Every structure is written in C-alpha cells, then in structure tokens.
C-alpha cells in the first residue's frame, strides 16, 4: 500500500482563538501523520517571514492546503504577504521557478455569510468561484494542480454537529488527499 501524499496545511487566521469553526476543522488535521499544520500567525506575529524556511517546507510536501477565513474577498493580510514573498519568481514562477510544478493547491475557506450571498444578483455580486479566481490563477502561475475549494459558508452560524460533520469529511480527505479528490 502506498503512502498518502504529504500535506502542508498553511493555517492563517489572525483571531484563531475566536474561530470555533476553524478550530473544529483543524482537529482532524492534527491527527494525521501525513499532515503538517503550520500556523502562520503563531509563527510570524511580526509578519517577518522566513522565506527560505517556507520554501523548504513547500518542497517537502505534495499537497498545499490554504485554510483561512475569507477577509474582504481575499485572505488575511499575513497570508497575502506569505504568497507574495514565498511564491517568488525564480522559485515558483518565471525562469527557473519550477519548485511547485505538479503539486496540488486546495483552498479551505470559512465565510461569515451564507452561500446565497455569493451570486451575481446577491449581496456580494459575484459567485465564490469568481471571488477565489486570484488563488486559482496563483496556482496556475506556479503550475500547480488546482483542486476545488472546500468552503464552509456562514461558519459561525453552524451547529456543533454540522461543524463536526464538515471536520469529519475534511479529515477523511486529508488522510488520502490526491486519490480522494473532492470532499
């Protein structure tokens, strides 16, 4: 039996202590030997990112998961800084930038609004696929495989049972992320 893919879970939440949904989602990740949970806000409270260290982590893993809340139609500031610094030209793109070719990218997003708010005729004016397009384009720039995102809409309004169900499905996917496909 082959080993499961090595997963680097980049967790970026500036107020992690207040996010019940994200804490519940992280529980199964911590239990898998093939998953490295890397809390960016815990490691870099001053935003000074150790780029060589982060790039080494990326090289060691097959699947990169970006777990974060949706902040102003994007990611929290530290993750944006991480993307700009770590996925640099010559490492992830451009001449010689082939370090992430063939790896997998998956976004795991929590939102503060219901799924119905993400439509052309609704509050946010665009579907989530459009909102997340910059991440998909970044994955393409790095020549990574874009996996369909996991989105927990209106996360703070879910019952503990519903959050546990999301966490269970997420944990099952993390156990074998490449062959398991979507969740």
UniProtKB/Swiss-Prot annotation:
BP terms from Gene Ontology: positive regulation of potassium ion transmembrane transport; potassium ion transport
Subcellular location: Cell inner membrane
Membrane topology, as annotated: Peripheral membrane protein
Catalysed reaction equations from the record: a quinone + NADH + H(+) = a quinol + NAD(+); a quinone + NADPH + H(+) = a quinol + NADP(+)
GO molecular function, one term: electron transfer activity
Keyword Nucleotidyltransferase found: no
Entry superkingdom: Bacteria
GO CC annotations on file: plasma membrane
Similarity comment: Belongs to the NAD(P)H dehydrogenase (quinone) family. KefG subfamily.
Stored NCBIfam families: PRK04930.1
Protein name: Glutathione-regulated potassium-efflux system ancillary protein KefG
Species of provenance: Salmonella paratyphi C (strain RKS4594)
Gene behind the chain: kefG
